[in-house]
């Protein structure tokens, strides 16, 4: 598809915690939320990191549910159009500079026959300071 690109304008932001739907852990951050056509804002890693409980998502060890690729895929399965991951160094296990310098320009990919339905249309990252500003501007903390 020559000239194909995605754009979201005035997309509503919905905070979805870790953005995890894991039936085997009886965990679903999307339960009761309507994210269809919206942009989800997601914490990096998985719920086990915050609790350090080894019985919950392997505790401090990141599971597949903590990976950024999973978060974009799950957001798409839930009907979101965009997803923004909030980066924090400790739970990500790498600094903001890795994110900042890994994707420093436009990102291009091939448009598959399914129009890349396995991922949200727009993917992004913000650091904690920007996330705090977003929430403050929305009247949230």
Please report, for each region that a protein language model flagged, where it lies by residue.
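Detector for Asparagine
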Residues: 21, 28, 45, 58-60, ...
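Mixed-charge, polar/low-complexity N-terminal
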Residues: 15-16, 20-22, 58-59, 104-106, ...
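Structured segments of extracytoplasmic/periplasmic soluble domains
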Residues: 17, 33, 43, 71-74, ...
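Noncatalytic luminal/extracellular "stalk/propeptide" segments of secretory-pathway proteins
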Residues: 1-54
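Flexible, low-complexity junctional segments that flank or bridge functional domains
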Residues: 55-66, 70-77, 96-99, 103-109
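Long, well-ordered, tryptophan-enriched scaffold segments
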Residues: 77-94, 100-104, 108-141
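Second-shell loop/turn segments in exported
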Residues: 1-4, 15, 25-30, 54-72, ...
């Amino acid at each position: 598809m020559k000239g194909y690109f995605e754009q979201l304008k005035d997309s509503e932001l919905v905070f979805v915690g870790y953005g995890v739907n894991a039936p085997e852990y009886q965990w679903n951050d999307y339960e009761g939320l309507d994210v269809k056509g919206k942009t989800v804002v997601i914490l990096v890693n998985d719920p086990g990191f915050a609790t350090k409980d080894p019985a919950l998502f392997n505790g401090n060890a990141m599971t597949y549910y903590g990976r950024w690729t999973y978060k974009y895929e799950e957001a798409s399965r839930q009907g979101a159009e965009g997803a923004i991951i909030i980066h924090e160094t400790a739970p990500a296990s790498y600094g903001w500079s890795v994110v900042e310098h890994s994707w420093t320009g436009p990102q291009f990919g091939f448009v598959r026959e399914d129009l890349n339905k396995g991922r949200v249309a727009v993917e992004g990252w913000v650091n904690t300071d920007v996330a705090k500003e977003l929430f403050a501007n929305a009247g949230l903390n």
